[in-house]
Amino acid sequence: RMAMRIVYVNESLAKQKAEEAVNSEIGVMTVSTDGAYHKVVDHNPWERFMPNWGDARISADLVCYMNGYSDPRREVYYDKSTFATKGAYKGTEDYVGLRRGIRQGQYNSWSQGYSCMKVTVSDNMLIFPASEVTFLRAEGALRGWNMGGTAKALYEEAVSLSFDER
């Protein structure tokens, strides 16, 4: 991650550090179980406020993008909207995000219909996923760096990994 953050300031150092990380004896995260998680002791806070408090929902920006591409990760990441079953918006997508910046008073009565993140009480909280590392490796490979695979193969691997992470 650090290498991609400095690539526009010092590309040669970025390349050096990325290649050192990928090719070191320890290596980098490559499978979803390698991801950095915060262990939940009592109750996952996302589960507490996302579906129950009514004031936090999935962003419409992200959901519209994913709907537009029929992104199959939607069913892994989100619960379906209940608007269609309530008859609120006939013909809407199964996944409906809440528009950013809307005033709380404007959506209180409808907030329960928007899609929520799929999360349970005991889910650990993902901090740094292996899929992100693999996407970064794909970006490095696209720049011609030695990332242990082609940009295409690493990108596809990252997408695949992202299905196991949430």
Question: What is the predicted function of each stretch?
Answer:
Residues 4-12, 145-147:
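Short coil/turn linking the two alpha-helices of tandem helical-hairpin repeats
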Residues 15-137, 142-143, 148-166:
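Hydrophobic-face positions in mid-chain alpha helices that act as interaction patches
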